[in-house]
C-alpha cells in the first residue's frame, strides 16, 4: 500500500508507527522510498501500477521544493532510495549523492539529455515557461525573459522561491544568461518586480490564475494543465528561448533498496508510462523528444549547477535586504 508523507513530518509519523511494520506491510526487501516535489498527478498512477505489478510497497515523501530534498540527501541518512523529478542543473550540484544506473531502455533517450555517467535518468522533458492572466493583461503582454525586469511589472510577478524550488533557480540562471549587466543588478531588478516568492511552481500557476499576480514563471505541464482546465492563463514561450531540461529520476547512493529503485526507473521508461505522461500534457523522453519543441535557449545545466551555490548566496542577500 502506497503512503504519501510530507517530508518535514515524515520522521514524526514514522516514529509513531510502532516497533514494527503493520500486518499489511511487506518485508524490508520489498519496499521503496521515493522523495519528490512533483505533484501527485505526475507520480500517483505510475506508483499504483508499479506496486500492482511488482508487489513492491512504495512510500512517497513529499516537499514543496526540490532543493530541500537534495540538501537532505546530501546530509546523509535521509532514508530515501529515489529522487523523482529534478533537472540536471540542480542535480549536478549534488552529483556525488547519486548512484550511476544505465537502464535497459536508456538507449532510447536522446544523448543530449543523458548524463555522461548515468547518475540520473530522464523520463520527460520539462520546459520552463512564462504565464500571464489574460483577463488582467490584454495589451503589451510579456513575451520574453527581458520583460521580467521591466518596471511595467513592478510588484506583479510570481516566481517560485529559488532557495527552495529548482524552477525558481532555473529562472534566475536564464535571466543572467539572457540579460546584459552585472549579476547583482539583474537579480535586483527582478526581485523588485516580484509580488512575492512562492513555495512552488504549482503555487505560481494558482496565483496567476486567481489574479493575485499578473505574470509568472512556472513549468510547461502546470501551465498547460491550468489553461486546459479553463483558467484565465495564457502560456508564453520566451522569445529568447525556453529553458528545456529533462525531468529526471536519480538513485540515492548507498540507499537501502537500490534494486527496487532501478526497477522503478525501468518502469518510468516503459511505453505505457511514457504514453501516460503525454496524456498529462508532459513531454515523453523516449523517441523523438525534440519534436514540436518551442524555441530553446542554449543552456548549460552543468555550468549552472556549478554556479548555483554562489547564485543563491547573492539572491538570499538581496532578498534579506528587501525584507529589512
List the predicted regions and their residue ranges:
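C-terminal motif of bacterial Sec signal peptides marking the signal peptidase cleavage site
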Residues: 13-16
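Ligand-binding "clamshell"
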Residues: 94-102, 114-118, 225-237
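A structural signal for short loop-to-beta-strand junctions that line the ligand-binding cleft
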Residues: 78-83, 99-130, 146, 156-162
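Early extracytoplasmic/lumenal segment of secretory-pathway proteins
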Residues: 18-93
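Ligand-binding pocket segment of bilobal, Venus flytrap-like solute-binding proteins
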Residues: 173-240
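Mature extracytoplasmic/periplasmic domains
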Residues: 252-303
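Periplasmic solute-binding protein
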Residues: 88-96, 116-142, 170-174, 178, ...
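Periplasmic-binding protein-like
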Residues: 107-112, 126, 187-191, 197-198, ...
Amino acid at each position: 500500500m502506497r503512503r504519501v508523507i510530507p517530508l518535514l513530518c515524515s520522521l514524526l509519523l514514522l516514529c509513531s508507527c510502532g516497533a514494527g511494520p503493520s500486518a499489511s506491510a511487506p518485508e524490508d526487501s520489498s519496499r521503496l522510498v521515493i522523495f519528490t516535489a512533483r505533484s501527485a498527478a505526475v507520480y500517483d498512477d505510475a506508483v499504483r501500477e508499479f506496486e500492482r505489478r511488482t508487489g513492491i510497497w512504495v512510500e512517497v515523501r513529499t516537499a514543496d521544493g526540490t532543493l530541500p530534498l537534495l540538501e537532505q540527501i546530501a546530509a546523509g541518512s535521509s532514508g530515501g532510495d529515489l529522487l523523482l523529478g529534478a533537472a540536471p542543473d540542480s542535480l549536478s550540484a549534488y552529483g556525488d549523492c547519486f548512484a550511476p544506473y544505465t537502464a535497459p531502455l536508456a538507449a532510447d533517450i536522446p544523448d543530449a539529455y543523458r548524463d555522461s555517467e548515468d547518475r540520473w535518468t530522464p523520463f520527460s522533458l520539462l520546459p520552463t515557461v512564462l504565464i500571464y492572466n489574460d483577463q488582467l493583461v490584454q495589451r503589451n503582454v510579456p513575451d520574453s525573459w527581458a520583460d521580467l525586469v521591466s518596471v511595467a511589472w513592478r510588484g506583479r510577478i510570481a516566481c517560485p522561491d529559488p532557495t527552495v524550488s529548482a524552477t525558481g533557480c532555473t529562472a534566475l540562471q536564464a535571466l543572467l544568461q539572457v540579460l546584459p549587466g552585472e549579476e547583482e543588478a539583474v537579480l535586483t531588478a527582478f526581485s523588485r518586480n516580484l509580488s512575492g516568492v512562492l513555495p512552488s511552481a504549482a503555487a505560481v500557476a494558482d496565483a496567476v490564475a486567481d489574479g493575485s499576480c499578473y505574470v509568472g514563471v512556472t513549468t510547461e505541464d502546470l501551465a498547460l494543465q491550468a489553461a486546459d482546465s479553463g483558467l484565465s492563463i495564457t502560456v508564453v514561450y520566451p522569445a529568447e528561448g525556453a529553458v528545456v531540461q529533462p525531468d529526471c529520476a536519480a538513485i540515492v547512493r548507498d540507499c537501502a533498496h537500490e534494486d527496487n529503485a532501478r526497477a522503478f526507473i525501468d518502469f518510468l521508461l516503459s511505453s505505457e508510462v511514457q504514453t501516460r505522461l503525454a496524456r498529462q500534457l508532459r513531454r515523453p523522453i523516449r523517441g523523438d523528444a525534440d519534436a514540436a519543441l518551442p524555441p530553446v535557449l542554449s543552456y548549460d545545466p552543468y555550468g549552472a549547477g556549478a554556479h548555483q551555490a554562489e547564485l543563491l548566496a547573492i539572491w538570499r542577500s538581496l532578498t534579506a535586504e528587501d525584507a529589512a
